[in-house]
């Protein structure tokens, strides 16, 4: 596909798209526009061997102009338009009746966009499920938002309520877990860690103690939609242990975040920050779903220390890209969980230089990612294993470039957590120029 052949996807020629853009500008509330932006970035950067993508934003009045290195091919799912157009129906999952979903918040999360960019090769249902996992992460994470308040303003009952909700969510995920091997049961049981006392093992399953069964928490419809799909689509033929593992990892990370946020005097080194963020990045959950969609699947890869390192690097790179793009919002929120702030304080830098340093660290991590990729492929013992590992690595590569494009294309306020007017101006200027040249 190219800019000149986009009509097969968007049902509009370059001339028709240009005419529309000159009236509306680039937006995120017309799903066609994301195809034009993605294809433009692919042709102007990836196809020309330039893997440095521009980011233009502002932090505390400082102009941030940097480049995110990501040497993988940008692609948007062919199902994105259909996913976007069915979002009103999907939004019903996010509130317990009679309450209704806050569409302002739902639009800002824009999970269909993330899923379609970060899992572009999956079928419709699988792409929807990846999107739902990303939205689950945002909704769970937002339930810790009140912990950013001054310590004296934090309401203990809200902390208890969040813990109750988390137990219900964990219980639903564990209800679909039917271990194929005894070691799978023990792996999950041991990984529950400080949540273990709330659960018990009964007939090869892990269930929540009756006394902790609470009232129906928000987003339970979302959780049941995800677990029902995993149970029907994957559990009969494949080992779903990693899905459960990654959900527990993320939820444990939220608990750790609560603990850290409770200590307003905390400091983190960059190494400690990486280790913490490895636990509270949603991409491993989404990857565990996408991995299952392929015939070539290796559960034992998750036990390989090198593959675990590759997964962690993916999380860290996405986190660093996110930190650069969200630093102004998080500065205004007085949220210290950001590598830009850590390096700024450590080296007495301004925001511009700190962002540049974060981007450099991300580049170094991506170089390490590529080294590990080659080692994993070289060490594969047979062709089937090599094919499975290659596909699982490709899933992580798709996430990295998908997240990069996601941040670049935040061009509509209210349809992105971090609207970027400067990127909107950049994309409109260059896409309009390219479309005019095709006429």
Curated annotation (Swiss-Prot):
GO terms for molecular function: metal ion binding; transferase activity. Mg(2+) 2 binds at residues 330, 337. Its EC number is 2.5.1.-. Pathway: Secondary metabolite biosynthesis. It catalyses: dimethylallyl diphosphate + L-glutamate = prekainate + diphosphate. It holds the Pfam family Terpene_syn_C_2. Mg(2+) 1 binds at residues 322, 326, 330. Its cofactor is Mg(2+). SUPFAM superfamilies: Terpenoid synthases. InterPro entries: Isoprenoid_synthase_dom_sf. Changing residue 114 to T: Increased affinity for geranyl diphosphate (GPP) leading to an enhanced catalytic efficiency with GPP as substrate, but reduced activity with dimethylallyl diphosphate (DMAPP). Keywords: Magnesium, Metal-binding, Transferase. It is an enzyme of class 2 (transferase). Magnesium-dependent glutamate N-prenyltransferase: part of the gene cluster that mediates the biosynthesis of kainic acid (KA) and derivatives, natural products with neurochemical activity acting as ionotropic glutamate receptor (iGluR) agonists, thus being neurotoxins. Catalyzes the conversion of L-glutamic acid (L-Glu) to prekainic acid in the presence of dimethylallyl diphosphate (DMAPP). Can also use geranyl diphosphate (GPP) as substrate, thus leading to the formation of N-geranyl-L-glutamic acid (L-NGG). Belongs to the terpene synthase family. This is Magnesium-dependent glutamate N-prenyltransferase. It comes from Digenea simplex.
């Amino acid at each position: 596909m190219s800019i000149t052949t986009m009509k097969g996807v968007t049902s509009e020629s370059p001339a028709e798209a240009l005419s529309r853009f000159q009236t509306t500008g680039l937006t995120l509330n017309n799903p066609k526009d994301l195809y034009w932006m993605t294809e433009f970035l692919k042709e102007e950067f990836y196809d020309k061997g330039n893997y440095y993508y521009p980011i233009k934003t502002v932090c505390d009045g400082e102009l941030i102009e940097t480049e995110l290195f990501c040497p993988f091919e940008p692609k948007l799912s062919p199902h994105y338009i259909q996913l976007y157009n069915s979002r009103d129906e999907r939004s019903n999952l996010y509130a317990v009746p009679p309450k209704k979903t806050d569409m302002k918040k739902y639009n800002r999360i824009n999970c269909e966009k993330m899923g379609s960019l970060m899992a572009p090769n999956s079928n419709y249902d699988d792409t929807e499920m990846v999107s739902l996992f990303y939205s689950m992460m945002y909704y769970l994470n937002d339930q810790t938002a009140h912990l950013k308040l001054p310590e004296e303003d934090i309401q203990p009952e809200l902390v208890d309520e969040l813990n109750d909700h988390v137990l219900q969510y964990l219980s639903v995920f564990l209800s679909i877990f039917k271990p194929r091997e005894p070691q799978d049961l023990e792996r999950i049981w041991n990984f529950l860690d400080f949540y273990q006392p709330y659960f018990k093992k009964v007939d090869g399953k892990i269930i929540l103690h009756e006394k902790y069964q609470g009232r129906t928490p928000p987003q339970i419809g979302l959780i049941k939609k995800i677990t029902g799909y995993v149970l029907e689509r994957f559990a009969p033929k494949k080992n779903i242990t990693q899905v459960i593992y990654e959900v527990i990892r993320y939820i444990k990370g939220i608990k750790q975040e609560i603990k850290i946020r409770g200590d307003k005097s905390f400091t983190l080194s960059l190494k400690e920050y990486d280790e913490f963020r490895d636990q509270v990045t949603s991409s491993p959950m989404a990857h565990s779903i996408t991995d299952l969609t392929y015939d070539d699947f290796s559960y034992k890869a998750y036990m390989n220390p090198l593959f675990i390192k590759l997964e962690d690097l993916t999380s860290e790179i996405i986190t660093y890209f996110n930190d650069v793009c969200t630093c102004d919002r998080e500065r205004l929120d007085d949220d210290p969980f950001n590598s830009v702030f850590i390096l700024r304080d450590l080296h007495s830098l301004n925001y511009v230089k700190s962002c540049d340093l974060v981007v450099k660290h991300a580049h170094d991590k991506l170089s390490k990612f590529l080294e590990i990729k080659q080692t994993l492929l070289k060490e594969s013992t047979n062709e089937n294993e090599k094919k499975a590992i290659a596909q699982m690595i490709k899933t992580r590569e798709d996430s990295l470039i998908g997240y990069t494009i996601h941040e670049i294309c935040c061009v509509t306020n209210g349809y992105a957590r971090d609207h970027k007017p400067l990127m909107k101006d950049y994309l409109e200027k260059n896409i309009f120029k390219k479309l005019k040249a095709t006429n």
